[in-house]
Amino acid sequence: MTAEELTKLALEKMKTFSIQSVLPALRMANQGAIEDVLNTNGCANYQWFPCLIEVIKPKQIVELGGAMGVGSIMMLQSKYQDFKLYSITLPENKLEFSYVVDKYPNFYPIVGNDLDMNNWKDIDLSQTDLWYFDSEHTEEQLRKELDLYSSFFKKDAIVCFDDIHINDGMQKVWDEIREGKWGFSEYYDATDPLHWSGYGVTKV
């Protein structure tokens, strides 16, 4: 399936996604985070992502920019569970992944700089089926990440980008992605309804 078809199929599955059953896993999240998760009109990516996982059935997921863990928690609520999720985020005064209070046998949180490859020891990044770039939302950082990680992109991997229209720098990188830089064969702008600040779904 194309990036657009995958995006729309996951949106269709969202119609039967039980958000109420997920809320207990988010019990440590603040009210703002909960409101974002519940908002499917401009911020639907949270409920959409577990449905995307159900559609593509990845074995390995890498998330760059896990923060306090809301996105990770939502991914881990997918009906499909036969995957490992590696999520990395910078140290945040002990707040990193602080919303993740339940135990998930397939969740591997990493605290560190995603530009330091020493954080990925014993992890074969080339086996990643689904990537999510959601770190500092700056042109400089995203370029560095793509230059570093694109060599690990395997054919047909799905790569998602948050906040692609949030500033001129992020827009510039997205424009280059659309032109095929870093090896992408397809792209789909899913800003509406996934995230008002921009959301891109690509395929290698």
Show where each model-derived region lies.
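Rossmann-like AdoMet
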Residues: M1-T40
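S-adenosylmethionine/decaboxylated-SAM
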Residues: E35-V204
